Each structure stands twice: as structure tokens, then as C-alpha cells.
From Swiss-Prot:
One of its GO terms (molecular function) is 5-oxoprolinase (ATP-hydrolyzing) activity. The keyword Transferase does not apply. It is an enzyme of class 3 (hydrolase). This is 5-oxoprolinase subunit A. It comes from Rhodopseudomonas palustris (strain HaA2).
Amino acid sequence: MKIDLNCDLGEGFGAWSMGDDAAMMRIATSVNVACGFHAGDPDIMHKTVAMAKAHGVAIGAHPGFRDLHGFGRRPVPGITAAEIENLVAYQIGALQAVASLAGHKVTHVKAHGALSNVACQDDMTARAIAAAIKAVDPKLIFVVLANSKLVDAGEAAGLAMVHEVFADRAYEDDGNLVSRRKPGAVLHDPAVIAERVLRMAQDGAVVSMTGKVIKMRTDTVCIHGDTAGAVDIARGVRTALEANGITVAPFARS
């Protein structure tokens, strides 16, 4: 069995940084790079891509709503499908250009924050993201939340997909992520998270906040770089997987 560990990195801006990207880069096998709208800037993007290349880590675009102040975690009411297509294509293109400069290659796309959360439950948003990816490069892999509207959109667009589960986030009974506004939405105990991810990988299932077992295809596991204790969490997850004979490797080769 093989599984990928992905992490959202490059989420600083100017002199401000978030998380320990250097440490996470040594543990993750794929990283999703902020493209300047919710976080990131040209210098941080280049530094992140160059670091990924040096560690043999695959890179993907991590487009979000244009909301630096809110870190892309606030919905944008009234946004149109065309506007979503434009902002996603713009951000993918930005990372592709920076990656070319750094001698690396973008292999996948994963929507960030509110853009992803809305798309998981809204057909229009999900299809707009998929349409933008297909228009920019139909060979890009679409990272989708398992069992969500993103899966349907990716299938309709004919995109290759990787199904994602989250190590450090709680799930609702319908398979969607618990809102960060709710208590218990973000998990922090490395031992609990490692055991949880091992079950996800072995059983192809997650357990919701109420204890419901939800079957989910598990190709890649996300660990948020901005979660408190992220490095310890990531290290614990990788150690648990490998100790149980599961190969940790990128889903794409750049």
C-alpha cells in the first residue's frame, strides 16, 4: 500500500511567515503552494518551490479567494463561475511561472480554505475550479475531498484525481469537514491523529465527530502547516504509516 502526505506551505507574506516550512518539507511528499491570493508572494513562492525541488517533493498550486486579511477562509458571496475560473487559472499560472524559474514542475492543484469548502457542497464552484484546471493544463491532477462535489466535477471534466482526507480536521456525518468555528474542529494530539490516519489508510474510512464510520477513498492525507504542533503531527503520522508497512510517497512525479 502507498499513500501520500501533503501539506499547505508557502503561506507567509512579505516579512511575515507561518509554520515551519523547512521541517515540514522533510516529512511531506507533496506540498501545495499558496499563490498570492490568500497568502504567498513571488519571493516566498520561489523559495518554497526551490526547497521542494531540493527535497524531491512534488508541488501543486493552492489557489484561494483573494483575501489576504482573512487568509482565504471567508466565502465570497455572489462570486460567479467565470470569476472563479479566472482566479483559479491566474494562480495556477503564477505558480507554473515561478516553478519554471526554479527548475521544478507543477503536478497538481488543490483549492484552499473557503474556496474548497464551498466547492465541496456547491456544484457551480466545483465545476468552475475543474474547468480552470482543465483549461490551463488537463494533465494536472485535481486533489479533491473524498465523497464531495469536487469528485463529481473532476469526473465531468475528465481530470485525473487524487482523493484526500484530513489528518487534523474533524468530520461531520455527511463527510464534510467540521467548520473551524466549531469546538473540536481542529485536532492537535499527535498520537490520536497518527492512529486516526492509520485507520484511514488501512480501512479506507474516517470516523465523524458523532462516531459514524464513513467510507472514504484515501490517496493522500493532508496535514495543515499552520496547525499548532504540525511538525510533530506530521512526523508521528509518517512514522505510524511506515511502521505498519505503508509506503509514503508522492502521488505524482514531477
